[in-house]
A protein has these predicted regions:
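One-carbon transfer enzymes
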Residues: 1-246
């Protein structure tokens, strides 16, 4: 095997995709190793999965941080280098509110949490950051501090639909309810929007009249566990770079 890239993983829940990645590198199917697992949820079972394999873990309790900052003036609490106008100009998430004050509060509070997350990650140098069921939208403040080379994005996400169809939290459910005959999953680079980054890989499955939401999810998850390691391997081989349109 070639030189193994260092992969950091962020999760929010059970960590089944994390387990698939761990299994892939422990069986030498990918040129990678997981150097840390972090979560916004201190109770995430995926942290225990990582600990069983001796992988360092940490948790940044987003919910507690956001609750603590709610209703407080945050101008003096935001991290050094945070520029609200720059963040607002770059972000392409759907409008969070028509209330400018609430929008500003949202991005300031997330930057405060992200600064804590970045500080935790400093202890574990990494080449690629993988979101494996991390249920927080990353702001430009965070993304720009990980993606320091415009030609080489370093944050991957996996999404439960064939993007660009059905972005958002529950892609399998949306796919099923829309009546699609084909479902699937997508691995993409993370950009300033929600599930709008460059697509790296996709896998599809048939949806039959006998399928339910649960069986659709089951089919999708099995493909996710194949697709994510494959896309990490493409990154490890240096085959993923961003090129400007000619």
């Amino acid at each position: 095997m070639a030189h193994k890239i260092r992969v950091g993983v962020l999760i929010s829940g059970g960590g089944t995709n994390l387990q698939a990645i761990i299994d892939a590198y422990r069986s030498n199917r990918i040129d990678a190793r997981v150097v840390f697992v972090g979560s916004d949820n201190p109770e995430a079972y995926g942290l225990k999965r990582a600990q069983k394999h001796g992988i360092p873990t940490f948790a940044v309790d987003y919910q507690a941080i956001i609750k603590e900052t709610r209703g407080r003036p945050l101008e003096d609490l935001v991290p050094e280098g945070f520029d609200l106008e720059t963040v607002l100009a770059k972000q392409r998430v759907s409008p969070l509110s028509s209330d400018r004050t609430k929008v500003e509060q949202y991005f300031r509070s997330r930057a405060i949490a992200e600064a804590v997350l970045l500080k935790e990650m400093e202890a574990y140098p990494f080449d690629l950051l993988v979101l494996a069921g991390f249920m927080r939208i990353l702001t430009p403040y965070f993304i720009d501090r990980v993606n320091t080379d415009p030609s080489q994005p370093r944050i991957m996400n996996i999404h439960p639909s064939l993007l660009p169809s059905f972005p958002g939290q529950d892609g399998y459910c949306d796919t099923y309810r829309y009546g699609c005959k084909v479902g699937g999953c997508t691995v993409h680079f993370v950009d300033y929007g929600e599930d709008t980054g460059r697509i790296i890989g996709q896998k599809a499955f048939e949806i039959t009249p006998d399928d339910t939401i649960d069986t659709v999810r089951e089919k999708g998850l099995k493909l996710e566990w194949q697709l994510y390691p494959e896309c990490i391997q493409l990154f490890a081989e240096g085959r993923l770079r961003m090129e400007k349109p000619s």
